[in-house]
Design a protein with these regions (language model features):
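TRNA-recognition modules of translation machinery and tRNA-sensing kinases, especially anticodon-binding
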Residues: 114-395
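N-terminal alpha-helical targeting/anchoring segments
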Residues: 1-119, 132
Length: 395
């Protein structure tokens, strides 16, 4: 969540920044709710101070004391309601976008930063026509937007995840196999709830949710903790689940947009003064992984209005898909500044014993979409970098 104390001290700056992502109204509602709470707080303090009487009270004083208690109970109830309203409003305000985040409200407003590699024509076939991908049986077993990845194509995917994890471990990341069912607090702390709750699967009997990214458990694992050492670098492999409730009619063929997919994720905890350098380093790792597979791509700076609730800035890397004749997103890399850590109650010891809020970042190191890009760009030939991890030379 945003720092409400900082917002009180400089509301105009916060409002102007949040307006870039269409959240000025949400900020106004927060400030109004906070103003009411702050107005009621001293009233409660004053009424509590008036509850004591000196010496033996007269009947008139007892009657006055009874009236004060009734008034105190009423104002305390108002204060509790105001605090709940303020906290609910605070939960809905997204992170403040960084000044360098691109202007605009949609994915079409993203600003291209660079391109790498030659965007070739391919052989005209989509990935589902090249690899062993069975969407029909996936639909029979699980419904639409599910599929089986089989045989050599499955080996390519396994090799891809091994390739990414091997690189990240060599870069100093700690490998993690996280849980994929989490409590609501974990989804709230990472900023996915309440704004995107409809996008995630709920196991209602156990009050658990299937994660859409291992970013969630990698942040929640330090929830309500004080960290003694920064930075922390984690990488995780997990299955991910998304309802894709807003994707009706989009990418209905193949595995590009599905309800279940695999992903290798990076998560970093660091100090505020180091987080922007860390953001660039994570982007460089993503680029290096794609370059190692000789996949053409472009990097874009996401528009402020298209950022996730938690992100202050995000880079997307879009790989070239020749059968679609366009670049499509295969990674994202976000700096969430102190937003997730503040929501999750995570702090660290800064300069001795003082406590501060760390910055957290996340980025994609590999997903099933990379396998699709490999199939389309090379017509079934598999990069040597993956053959070293068990992939066949061709599928």
């Amino acid at each position: 969540m945003i720092d409400i104390r900082a917002a009180r001290n400089d509301p105009e700056r916060f409002r102007a920044a949040l307006a870039r992502r269409g959240a000025a109204t949400a900020f106004d509602e927060l400030m109004a709710a906070d103003a009411l709470w702050r107005e009621l707080l001293p009233q409660v303090d004053d009424l509590r101070a008036q509850q004591k009487l000196q010496g033996k009270p007269t009947p008139e004083q007892l009657e006055e004391l009874r009236a004060r208690k009734e008034r105190l109970a009423a104002v305390e109830a108002e204060l509790a309601a105001a605090e709940a309203a303020r906290d609910a409003a605070l939960a809905k305000v997204p992170n403040v976008p960084h000044d360098s985040a691109a202007d605009g409200m949609t994915e079409d407003d993203a600003v291209e930063i660079k391109r790498w590699g030659e965007a070739g024509p391919g052989d005209g076939r989509e990935a589902s026509e090249i690899g062993q991908i069975d969407m029909e049986r996936g639909a029979k077993v699980s419904g639409s937007r599910f599929g089986f990845i089989l045989d050599g194509t499955a080996l390519v995917s396994f090799a891809l995840y091994h390739y990414a994890l091997d690189r990240l471990v060599n870069e100093g990341f700690t490998a993690v196999l996280p849980p994929v069912l989490v409590r609501e607090e974990a989804m709230y702390g990472t900023g996915f709830f309440p704004s995107d709750k409809a996008d995630y699967y709920e196991v209602t009997a156990d009050k658990l949710y299937l994660v859409g990214t291992s970013e969630v458990p990698l942040i929640a694992m330090h929830m309500d903790e004080i960290l003694d050492m920064l930075p922390l670098h984690y990488c995780a492999f997990s299955s991910c689940f998304r309802r894709e409730s807003g994707a009706a009619g989009r990418d209905t063929r193949g595995l590009f947009r599905v309800h279940q997919f695999q992903k290798v994720e990076m998560v970093v905890y660091t100090t505020p003064d180091a987080s922007w350098d860390e953001h660039e380093r994570m982007l460089a790792i993503e680029e290096s992984l794609l370059q190692g597979l000789d996949l053409p791509y472009r990097v874009v700076n996401t528009a402020a209005g298209d950022l996730s609730s938690a992100a202050a800035k995000r880079y997307d890397i879009e790989a070239w898909f020749p059968a679609q004749d366009r670049y499509r997103e295969v990674t994202s890399c976000s700096n969430t500044t102190d937003y997730q850590a503040r929501r999750s109650g995570i702090r660290y010891r800064a300069g001795g014993k003082s406590l501060d809020t760390p910055h957290t970042l996340n980025g994609t190191a590999a997903t099933d979409r990379w396998t699709l890009a490999i199939l389309e760009n090379f017509g079934g030939a598999i990069p040597e970098a993956l053959q070293r991890f068990g992939a066949p030379a061709r599928v």
